[in-house]
């Protein structure tokens, strides 16, 4: 099951490539769009980490059965971790692609200057530039404040499933140190971080996809055997 990133959708390069790969391996595969993303309805401004987590859990509960391998990209890595904690009996393995746990606090709020924080607190919304979209992205106070209910990197993360993290060392959006911090917080599980020296945030190049496919096949083989 593939979980996209913030402002991404189920028709991105990684999602569609992974769908094709899983077909060739006869792996069941599911991808979806969060509320306010892609083909799903809703105002993006009303979205929060909790709401998007609820979307993921609804998909797990209503549309899947048996053991699950979650593959989360960027914010999807955060959602995947939260889903694994909420459904430990279902999630048997997890792969994070440039995972971004706590990004609303560390990479949004933590990077705002005093004037920007004041504007967000007063207006409830801030327009942020994006390297991937022509228009500015609306960042809401609700996104930041609700995100604080789901922070993971402030304490131990007790997962029972194996975790594999892939992160580019040239990632300009989510520093690769985030995956190293995540590794330190994971307890009770086997976790591996693979750093890609020249990798960016998206990790959508052919060589990146090959690395992802290998990780998926290895994880799937473990809990299918």
State where each predicted segment sits.
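Alpha/beta-hydrolase active-site loop
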Residues: 46-63
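Conserved alpha/beta-hydrolase
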Residues: 19-41
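The serine-hydrolase catalytic nucleophile loop
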Residues: 7-19, 177
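Short glycine-enriched nucleophile-adjacent loop
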Residues: 77-88, 94
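Alpha/beta-hydrolase fold nucleophile elbow
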Residues: 63-74
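The alpha/beta-hydrolase serine catalytic core
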Residues: 69, 90-196, 200-225
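Active-site loop->helix "elbow" adjoining a glycine-rich segment at hydrolase catalytic centers
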Residues: 74-77, 99
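Short beta-strand element of the alpha/beta-hydrolase
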Residues: 1-5
């Amino acid at each position: 099951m593939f979980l996209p990133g913030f402002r991404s959708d189920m028709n991105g390069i990684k999602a569609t490539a992974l769908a094709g790969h899983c077909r060739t391996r006869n792996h069941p595969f599911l991808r979806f769009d969060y509320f306010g993303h892609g083909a799903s309805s809703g105002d993006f401004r009303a979205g929060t980490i909790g709401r998007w987590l609820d979307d993921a859990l609804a998909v797990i509960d209503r549309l899947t059965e048996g053991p699950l391998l979650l593959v989360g990209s960027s914010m999807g890595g955060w959602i995947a971790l939260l889903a694994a904690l909420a459904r430990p009996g279902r999630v048997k393995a997890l792969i994070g692609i440039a995972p971004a746990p706590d990004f609303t606090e560390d990479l949004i709020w933590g990077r705002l200057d005093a004037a920007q924080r004041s504007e967000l607190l007063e207006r409830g919304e801030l327009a942020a530039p994006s390297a991937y979209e022509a228009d500015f992205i609306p960042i809401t106070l609700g996104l930041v404040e609700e995100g604080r209910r789901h922070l993971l990197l402030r304490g131990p993360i007790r997962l029972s499933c194996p975790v594999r993290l892939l992160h580019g060392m040239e990632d300009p959006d989510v520093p690769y140190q985030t995956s190293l911090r995540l590794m330190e917080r994971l307890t009770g599980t086997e976790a591996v971080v693979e750093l890609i020296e020249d990798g960016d945030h998206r990790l959508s190049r052919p060589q990146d996809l090959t690395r992802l496919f290998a990780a998926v096949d290895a994880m799937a083989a473990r809990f299918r055997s």
